[in-house]
A protein has these predicted regions:
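Short acidic, hydrophobic short linear motifs in intrinsically disordered regions
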Residues: 24-35
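Short alpha-helical segments that sit at the start of domains
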Residues: 1-16, 98-103
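Short helix-to-turn junction characteristic of helix-turn-helix DNA-binding domains
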Residues: 19-23
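Exposed, interaction-prone assembly regions rather than primary DNA-binding/catalytic cores
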Residues: 93-199, 203-206
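Accessory beta->alpha helical hairpin/"wing" motif in late/C-terminal subdomains of nucleic-acid enzymes
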Residues: 49, 58-90
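Short secondary-structure junctions
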Residues: 57-59, 122-127, 288-298
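Short amphipathic alpha-helical interaction segments
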Residues: 37-53, 59
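Long, compositionally biased intrinsically disordered regions
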Residues: 180-189, 201-214, 218-394
Length: 394
């Protein structure tokens, strides 16, 4: 195989090949998203057609289920063109490229990787930094990065329980570790398995450099491809049978931990809004100022997600602008605790663009929904206010 090493790859081609390598397949949905950003002609002609004609990729599947995988020559091509970018031995070409179960997860991974790229989260070679962190060595984290399930299992034998779950990897920021899941309507999480995996994560990072050794700095994010998948995750089906897959029960088990939902079909907030601690606090402050939320007393430990109380009342306020499933489950549990009256109220703070979605989740139980009031603000106006572009939010 003859390859011109010095000729740089275009951004579109480099990204396409990188995702195909790391995810093991690039799905039709990911291709569609790339066409939106780079242009139909660029992806179809300058990327897919050229790589196919040279024998570097091959198409598998049919119709909406199609995807592209690297060939043996394609794998060698990526190693030559980007020699230091990935731990290539970990991402050797799959031997079961037509296995349907494996394909579902690989295709989902490719879409997650593309959204991470859009949000400025790198997914190239960071295994060395992760190893250093786990071993307690100093690690300078300049920008958020993503490390895949495959890399993590190679890094620590304590994390082998990652296999068989909807766990995809972790996002590492300057202050925290965020466990990445991508469940769906057909692939719910097993609460017991995920609880065990969380214990493995906390154990593995117990000797890490501060602040990564603190369990409070380990969080969750759930990537959903459709709103239907997200809505279904709040279904209480199988709630009483611990052997049944139930993402809702997983939410309940992690109720006291910080978590977020990212909608890949059109997320309202940016990933940086939750990864950047200062930005997150700024958004919380805007909602608190606008709706006159009084901060809770330090001694109020009933629920970590109660951020305060509305004006001078005893109405609890929950921040839900990050679509936190643990906060929503906590808010629901709040209405079921002893002493909560039939006329009791709970306020949920969210972005205007997500208000209908949250209301739809709550309306699955009419008796429950009557206890909630949704307080919303437009995302763009909140950002403009934080950036000093407008003096106030109308």
């Amino acid at each position: 195989m003859s390859v011109t090493v010095n000729k740089p790859l275009s951004l579109a081609k480099e990204l396409f090949l990188s995702i195909a390598l790391v995810a093991q397949e690039i799905s039709s949905d990911t291709v569609k998203e790339m066409k939106k950003d780079f242009g139909e002609s660029v992806i179809r002609n300058s990327v897919i057609r050229i790589l196919t004609n040279k024998g570097y990729i091959q198409k598998i599947g049919e119709r909406s289920e199609y995807g592209y995988v690297l060939t043996g020559d394609g794998y060698d091509y990526v190693r030559i063109k980007m020699p230091d970018k990935f731990p290539y031995l970990i991402f050797r070409a799959p031997t079961h490229i037509y296995d349907r179960v494996r394909r579902v997860k690989r295709r989902q991974m490719s879409l997650v990787l593309y959204h991470l790229y859009r949000e400025g989260v790198a997914f190239d070679h960071h295994l060395t930094e992760l190893d250093a962190m786990i071993n307690g060595e100093p690690a300078e984290i300049k920008e958020p990065f993503f490390v895949t399930q495959r890399e993590i299992s190679q890094s620590s034998t304590q994390l082998n329980t990652a296999y068989g779950t909807r766990f995809f990897g972790v996002i590492v920021t300057q202050t925290k570790i965020i466990i990445v899941y991508a469940p769906s309507k057909d692939k719910n999480l097993y609460a017991r398995t995920e609880s065990g995996f969380y214990q493995s994560i906390t154990c593995a990072f117990s000797a890490a450099t501060p602040p990564f050794n603190l369990p409070t700095n380990i969080e969750y994010i759930y990537f959903y491809q459709t709103d239907e998948d997200m809505m279904d995750s709040f279904s209480e089906k199988g709630k009483r049978n611990v052997h049944t897959a139930s993402t809702y029960r997983t939410y309940c088990n992690s109720r006291l931990k910080q978590s977020y939902i990212y909608r890949m079909n059109g997320n309202t907030f940016r990933l940086s809004d939750i990864l950047d601690t200062d930005k997150r606090k700024a958004i919380d402050a805007v909602f608190s100022e606008y709706y006159e939320v009084q901060p809770r007393a330090v001694s109020h430990l009933k629920d970590v997600h109660v951020c305060g109380f509305y004006r001078n009342t005893d109405i609890p306020v929950f921040m839900l602008w990050d679509l936190s499933p643990s906060a929503l489950v906590s808010a629901i549990d709040y209405t079921r605790q002893p002493g909560f009256g039939i006329d009791g109220k709970v306020y949920l703070m969210c972005f205007e663009e997500d208000a209908d979605l949250i209301a739809e989740i709550l309306n699955t139980d009419r008796q429950l929904a009557k206890h909630f009031a949704i307080c919303d603000l437009p995302y763009q106006e909140v950002m403009q206010y934080i950036n000093g572009e407008i003096a106030r939010i109308d």
